[in-house]
Design a protein with these regions (language model features):
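C-terminal motif of bacterial Sec signal peptides marking the signal peptidase cleavage site
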Residues: 17-20
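Extended ligand-binding regions for polar small-molecule ligands
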Residues: 22, 67-76, 142-148, 153-155, ...
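Extracytoplasmic small-molecule ligand-binding "clamshell" domains
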Residues: 25-106, 255
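Flexible hinge/capping segments at coil-to-helix
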Residues: 35, 132-149
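Periplasmic-binding protein-like
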Residues: 48, 125-132, 202, 210-250, ...
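Ligand-binding cleft/hinge of the Venus flytrap
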Residues: 56, 70-79, 157-179, 209-214
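Short helices/loops that flank or line small-molecule/ion binding pockets
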Residues: 75-76, 84-85, 89-102, 116-118, ...
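A ligand-binding cleft/hinge motif common to bilobed small-molecule-binding domains
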Residues: 90, 107-115, 160-163, 188-192, ...
Length: 280
């Protein structure tokens, strides 16, 4: 057999092997818990630029509050967690297609999203803020009149921006926000004065600017929207996974592990009343 034929045979068997090793997509219409237990894993979709919730470090490793929390939860569930970076703007589509089994990365539980996704109990609160350079002299929403705004496509902040135009959209330049695929891209444009302010999660803004040592160069102020709850999103049919996630959250708090992770990333206990078991 000549080299060309050998190469073709090798490529064929390699492709066959790789396909066989690929995790089969989950059926979006059924409870997949038995499947997860049999294969020993679930796939979590996340935005690998969302510091400090879940992000990729320079060495290629994943880190963040949600990454640590998911790993602790996976031990409770007795299954492995596979982290899959996704286009955040396509997260619900990825979930419904069965290519991921959960959305877990600072994912805000909004009424609009509840139409497609089943949420766990919320595990922490967040607020949408505006970040601007102090040199721009923008310190409140009213200062945003005719200013250029940036936001991440598909983010809860952008959904608020579009859904409640009277609070911010109607006053910014052209009544629109420049959309970015990642927060990092938006921050680069903010730093280079291509946008005047960035609509962003408070947890990201505080952590990133503090870590970079540039917090004193920026103004951070409320965007005017209600605070939001972070939760894990699964397919509505996956009720067993949903119940097990909720149980694991509460148990981790009772054991003090949730607080350890929270202190590591935020320097405080960010757990919701539901996680603490104090909800009326």
């Amino acid at each position: 057999m000549n080299r060309k034929k050998i190469s073709l045979v090798f490529v064929f068997f390699l492709a066959f092997f790789l396909v066989g090793c690929t995790q089969k997509a989950s059926d979006p219409k059924v409870d997949n818990w038995d499947k997860y237990q049999k294969q020993g894993s679930i796939t979590i979709g996340f935005d690998n630029t969302f510091v400090p919730m879940g992000f990729e470090e320079k060495n290629g490793q994943y880190a963040g509050f949600d990454i640590d929390l998911a790993q602790e939860v996976s031990e409770k569930l007795g299954i492995h967690v596979h982290f899959q970076p996704i286009d955040w703007d396509m997260k619900e589509t990825e979930l419904q297609n069965g290519t991921i089994d959960a959305i877990w990365n600072g994912y805000s539980a909004t009424d609009e999203r509840r139409e497609k996704v089943a949420f766990t109990i919320p595990y922490m609160q967040n607020q949408q803020v505006l970040v601007s350079k102090k040199s721009q002299n923008i310190q409140s929403v009213s200062d945003m009149k005719d200013k250029v705004l940036g936001a991440q496509a598909g983010s809860s902040g952008y959904l608020d921006f579009e859904g409640q135009p009277e609070l911010l959209k109607n006053i910014v330049k052209d009544q629109k926000a420049n959309q970015y695929q990642s927060f990092n891209e938006a921050l680069i444009d903010l730093q280079n004065d291509r946008i005047d302010a960035l609509l962003i999660d408070r947890v990201y803004a505080n952590y990133y600017l503090q870590t970079e040592g540039i917090l004193e160069q920026y103004e951070i102020f409320p965007a005017g929207f209600e605070s939001e709850s972070f939760a894990v999103g699964v397919r509505p049919a996956d009720q067993t996974l949903l119940a097990n996630l909720n149980k694991a959250f509460v148990e981790l708090y009772q054991e003090g592990k949730f607080q350890e992770i929270s202190q590591k990333w935020f320097g405080e206990d960010v757990a919701t009343e539901q996680i603490k078991g104090e909800e009326n």
